[in-house]
Amino acid sequence: MPRLFGTDGVRGLANGTLTADLALGLAQAAAAVLTRGRSAEARRAVGKRPLAIVARDPRVSGEFLSAAVAAGLASSGIDVYDAGVIPTPAAAFLIADFDADFGVMVSASHNPAPDNGIKIFARGGTKLPDVVEDRIEEHLHLEKLTPTGAEVGRIQCFADAEDRYVLHLLASLPHRLDGIHVVLDCAHGAAAGISPEVFTDAGARVTVIGDAPDGMNINDGVGSTHLDRLAEAVLAAGADVGIAHDGDADRCLAIDASGRTVDGDQIMAILALGMKERGKLRDDTLVATVMSNLGLKLAMREAGVRVVETAVGDRYVLEEMNGHGYSLGGEQSGHVIMSDFATTGDGILTGLHLLSEMARQRKTLAELAQAMTVYPQVMVNVRGVDHHSVHSDELLRSAVEAVEAALGDSGRVLLRPSGTEPLVRVMVEAADQETAVRMANELADVVRERLAG
């Protein structure tokens, strides 16, 4: 039976694979697993029940799914603070700020509106390790907690959830944004009610698109996966910069004044150099994934910043950061984690600090983005192959080594087998697009030949 939890919680078609029954069951299982710690026991010792935060993005299905989650928790003896529609990083912050035992976010992030998901955070607002998710999944089929009478949980509105998060974001800023004109694309998502307020309070002149969520238009032609509209809006408004969020606002991508995209790698480069200059980049180290652009690594090396690589996924970036106390990490996709202020990727926080660097250095985004050269990166997906043998086939390994030798210090090769299907991703970076395309296709042919299913 396939694992229920994916790389970012449980996701599926709302009311299809992800039903109210499953949401309720997951909440009950989470309650059984996550209330065994000292914090929950200390609450019980003084006559209090364990506490959880529940929140959601504005998808129409989020209403019944979050209600099912809250019901599952309360029926297990957990007091629930319902924060309503807020960004995922806001929920993570509130779990820590309110000293809750854990929390649940109902969102499918950048996925289309018919999908939804359930993401569970541990005490402190951190993502759950795989082993804890496995225990929750096992508990779906075990006996649930069944308190009665005064021992059942209460559900109440978390009335000042947004205000707490907004004040936290503003307090994190090292420099105000006065004089900067920004276009915000809120993806018709969870950022629509918060991001414009925060950027305005920080001093920026704000134009907003994608700020009218109706439950079904989340990520629909807007947000961090659809940057064309934001680029057009930046040019039309004559703005200095554009900031794009995704549906739950845990990502940030940017557009410069000329309409060019500034991706997560470039944002990390800008923030890392600024933090190093201000003495805030712990151990002069940046955590990135194996998919981050070669240009990021070269630029950081030249600036005296060490880059530590992890597997793809912000959870692995965060594990590395937490394990060694690093202060900055992220992904090319725009998940950027600033651990001094957040326990997960925070698109609003990232955008604020990016604009803060523009204001502090009195430079345009295009000027700051010159901190790194973006190498052409070509990805070819090879399907229907034995992906388990990708690192053991000798002739394939020789072909990879030959391409690496030809590229030298001006490129790199990465073969990534899928964890869920017979697919191998062939990625090549080179100094020019033509070389990257040619070598990626050549290697893809070798993969097909050697690993044919």
UniProtKB/Swiss-Prot annotation:
Active site (catalytic residues): S109 (phosphoserine intermediate)
Record has Metal-binding as a keyword: yes
Catalytic reaction equation(s): alpha-D-glucosamine 1-phosphate = D-glucosamine 6-phosphate
PTM summary: Activated by phosphorylation.
EC number: 5.4.2.10
Keywords from the named record: Isomerase, Magnesium, Metal-binding, Phosphoprotein
GO molecular function ontology, one term from the record: magnesium ion binding
Residues the entry annotates as binding Mg(2+): S109, D246, D248, D250
GO biological process: carbohydrate metabolic process; peptidoglycan biosynthetic process; UDP-N-acetylglucosamine biosynthetic process
Required co-factors: Mg(2+)
PANTHER family found in the cross-reference section: PHOSPHOGLUCOMUTASE (ALPHA-D-GLUCOSE-1,6-BISPHOSPHATE-DEPENDENT) (PTHR42946:SF1), PHOSPHOHEXOSE MUTASE (PTHR42946)
Protein name in UniProt: Phosphoglucosamine mutase
High-level lineage: Bacteria, Bacillati, Actinomycetota, Actinomycetes, Micrococcales
